[in-house]
């Protein structure tokens, strides 16, 4: 059976993105969380709302673009893959997080350029690299091959 790891989600940033560069190599990386709202009717036919909070990580030029264009409450559409990472917390406990590693991010809010409305922004990570951070912020990476 083929393995598929693909996520597309739209939502709003819960706070400003956190931008940094890795300790080894200075590779740009940004983390942010989005809230994705879902409306549905319950068994009594009353409208209910549920919110799902999802963490997102982006690398390289995609990270820099997020730093420059996104703020708390910005609307985005994220296309990426799920990744999990585990680390030891300062208290010695093991922690695991599942987040989306972004391949493409579409900025859904219109941006102003020279006082005029601009088109929605769309940025893609075309490096074909997979990046991971260990608990000390050191990056290790591997590239995947594409048939392109």
Swiss-Prot record:
NCBIfam families: ssb
Name of protein: Single-stranded DNA-binding protein 2
Pfam families: SSB
Domain SSB: 4-109
A GO cellular-component term linked to this record: nucleoid
Keyword tags: DNA-binding
UniProt xrefs under PANTHER family: SINGLE-STRANDED DNA-BINDING PROTEIN
InterPro entries attached to this UniProt entry: NA-bd_OB-fold, Primosome_PriB/ssb, ssDNA-bd
Subunit annotation: Homotetramer.
A GO molecular-function annotation: single-stranded DNA binding
One GO BP annotation of this record: DNA replication
């Amino acid at each position: 059976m083929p393995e598929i790891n693909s996520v597309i989600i739209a939502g709003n940033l819960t706070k400003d993105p956190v931008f940094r560069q890795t300790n080894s190599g200075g590779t740009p990386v940004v983390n942010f969380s989005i809230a994705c709202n879902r409306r549905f009717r319950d068994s009594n036919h009353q409208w209910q709302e549920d919110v799902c909070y999802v963490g997102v990580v982006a690398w390289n030029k995609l990270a820099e673009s997020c730093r420059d264009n996104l703020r708390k409450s910005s609307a985005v559409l994220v296309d990426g893959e799920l990744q999990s990472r585990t680390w030891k917390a300062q208290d010695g406990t093991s922690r695991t997080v599942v987040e989306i590693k972004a391949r493409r991010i579409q900025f859904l809010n219109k941006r102003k350029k020279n006082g005029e409305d601009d088109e929605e922004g769309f940025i893609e990570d075309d490096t074909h690299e997979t990046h991971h951070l260990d608990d000390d912020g050191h990056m290790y990476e591997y590239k995947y091959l594409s048939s392109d």
